[in-house]
Amino acid sequence: MKKKLINFNNSLVLVVGDLILDCYWYSKNHYMLSEQLTPIVPINKIKEQPGGAANVAKNIAEIGGYTKIVGFIGMDNEGLILKKLMDHIRIDSDLISIKNNKTITKIRILSEKKQLIRVDFQEKYISNKNNLLHQKIIDSISSFKILVLSDYAKGTLANIQNIIDLAKKMSIPILIDPKGIDFKKYSGASLLTPNLFEFEKIVGKCYRENEILQRGIKLLSELQLSALLVTRSKNGMTLFQKEKKPIHFPAASKIASDVTGAGDTVIAIIAASLATGYSLEEACFYANIGASIVIQKIGTETLNINELNSVLNHQ
């Protein structure tokens, strides 16, 4: 594939989904309190990052695209922190604060670049404001070229089929990063981007390459998708499209320091690429390169357009 300098300055992407605050507590070392067998972890640094759907929006903003995010947060300090983080990187946000809910927060404690434990607050957003969420999507969607639905199974996309139907009526492509064991709710999407683990939970364990190909083609048809992209970590990614042969993109890097957020990077680059006018094959090629960059970083990290172009020019 021909390589060139790319930019996503004209991309307009609406993101809807589960917003999460990712917190990283770093320690240079940890030790055991011998008499109680209790681990002691002195914290040297704390870092907070947009996570979940907010990380998708962050990825789009960092590579130069314009994005707006719609979703829920809690009425708490964590929600304010998340909103401030997104404002800082020029993400337009239209958020609904929910009473008696905490902003979904994940705290990862790391020592010597290894994660020791993850602590989660608030399992799901519990809200009666789904109609308000849908109205906010209606108010915004006509200004965007692509819709991304980022599903972390945290409750925001409870009425996802209604959102898909709305976007289809307006001829706006719908890209979905799925979660869970019910993929039927994603029927009719333009593109679904499960990782191999998520894919196998739906179609069964795949022991051979031809099983992935056969079951991918079948799932594409069953869900009436325009395309299906299965991300496969060190084995790259495989794209299925209607009436086309599957296309495999070998992994651009076999080195992975941390795969956290890599799926967000993939769908963000694809969305920005399609919104700019690149083909789906080009979009997946760029996303594959982008994922190879972020998995070499620790935590929920993004990349910028200069990093992406630098790697492209050395392919």
Curated annotation (Swiss-Prot):
PANTHER family membership: BIFUNCTIONAL PROTEIN HLDE (PTHR46969:SF1)
Organism: Buchnera aphidicola subsp. Acyrthosiphon pisum (strain APS) (Acyrthosiphon pisum symbiotic bacterium)
GO CC terms: cytosol
Pfam families the UniProt entry points to: PfkB (PF00294)
Enzyme class: transferase
SUPFAM superfamilies reported for this sequence: Ribokinase-like
Keywords per UniProt: Kinase, Transferase
EC numbers, comma separated: 2.7.1.-
GO molecular function: heptose 7-phosphate kinase activity; heptose-1-phosphate adenylyltransferase activity; phosphotransferase activity, alcohol group as acceptor
Source domain of life: Bacteria
NCBIfam families: rfaE_dom_I
InterPro entries: Carboh/pur_kinase_PfkB_CS, PfkB_dom, RfaE_dom_I, Ribokinase-like
Name of the protein in question: Uncharacterized sugar kinase BU060
Record CDD domains: RfaE_like
Similarity-based family: Belongs to the carbohydrate kinase PfkB family.
